[in-house]
């Protein structure tokens, strides 16, 4: 669906206000957080109403969402156990599986998380 123009500050302000129930009611936020488990091949990812939940062995639960298209990736995550936010926009992205997607989705995120939490 594309079409949203933003930056890391706006994404942070939006996600923080959402997680603190400043944008919607607490009951609506609870509905968004009522997640369902994905198929076995995505065992660490769950989805709610517009929110994605990722379980990381070291850093715990991440709540947020990401998006990508050819040449661009953005992600906005909240780590409630650490009360920390990870938000980035980069000029690299692909919509197909492969080494570039893995580099961005796994290696890049892991490098940032290790600096953020260690």
Show the residue positions of the predicted features.
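Catalytic loop of the DD-peptidase/beta-lactamase superfamily, centered on the K-T-G motif
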Residues: 1-118
């Amino acid at each position: 669906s594309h079409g949203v123009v933003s930056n890391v500050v706006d994404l942070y302000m939006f996600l923080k206000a959402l997680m603190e129930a400043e944008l919607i009611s607490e009951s609506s936020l609870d509905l968004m957080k009522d997640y369902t488990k994905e198929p076995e091949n995505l065992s660490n990812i769950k989805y709610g109403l517009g929110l994605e939940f990722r379980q990381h062995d070291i850093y715990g639960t991440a709540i947020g969402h990401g998006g990508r298209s050819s040449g661009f990736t953005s992600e906005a995550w909240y780590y409630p156990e650490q009360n920390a936010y990870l938000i980035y926009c980069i000029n690299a992205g692909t919509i197909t599986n492969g080494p570039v997607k893995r580099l961005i989705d796994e290696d890049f995120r892991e490098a940032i998380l290790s600096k953020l939490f260690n």
